[in-house]
UniProtKB/Swiss-Prot annotation:
It is found in: Secreted. GO terms for biological process: adult feeding behavior; cell-cell signaling; epigenetic programming in the zygotic pronuclei; generation of precursor metabolites and energy; hormone-mediated signaling pathway; melanin biosynthetic process; melanosome organization; melanosome transport. It is linked to Obesity and hypopigmentation: An autosomal dominant disorder characterized by early-onset obesity, overgrowth, hyperinsulinemia, and hypopigmentation of the skin. Some affected individuals experience hyperphagia and exhibit reduced energy expenditure. GO terms for cellular component: extracellular space. Its main location: secreted. This is Agouti-signaling protein. GO terms for molecular function: melanocortin receptor binding; neuropeptide hormone activity; signaling receptor binding; type 3 melanocortin receptor binding; type 4 melanocortin receptor binding.
Length: 132
């Protein structure tokens, strides 16, 4: 009985070791530069060379001025409000926070939209965007 338990324990340890070892990626042992060159997937001759060029003072100033122009144009664009053309109000319309089930007419507020919940059982006109 003890021999079978010892055999089963050894088998269990072997299976655990084999399972853990099979999930690890294989390690590559490179011995010298020749094996490194033969095993590498990227050929170093195919990569284009990179040249570093020093900038003079004039090009730095032009770059700084262009960056400042971009910053100022972005600030001006963000400060300007986009004016949306208002749709003419139709006579039969639904006020904000009132029920607006699909056969009902559109919402009176142009910034509001009909929002339904619970599988379109409860619908109401709501203003979604505060910037409108």
């Amino acid at each position: 009985m003890d021999v079978t338990r010892l055999l089963l324990a050894t088998l269990l340890v072997f299976l655990c070791f084999f399972t853990a070892n099979s999930h690890l990626p294989p390690e590559e042992k490179l011995r010298d530069d020749r094996s490194l060159r033969s095993n590498s997937s990227v050929n170093l001759l195919d990569v284009p060379s990179v040249s570093i060029v020093a900038l003079n003072k004039k090009s730095k100033q032009i770059g700084r001025k262009a960056a400042e122009k971009k910053r100022s144009s972005k600030k001006e664009a963000s400060m300007k409000k986009v004016v949306r053309p208002r749709t003419p109000l139709s006579a039969p319309c639904v006020a904000t926070r009132n029920s607006c089930k699909p056969p009902a007419p559109a919402c009176c507020d142009p910034c509001a939209s009909c929002q339904c919940r619970f599988f379109r059982s409860a619908c109401s006109c709501r203003v979604l965007s505060l910037n409108c």
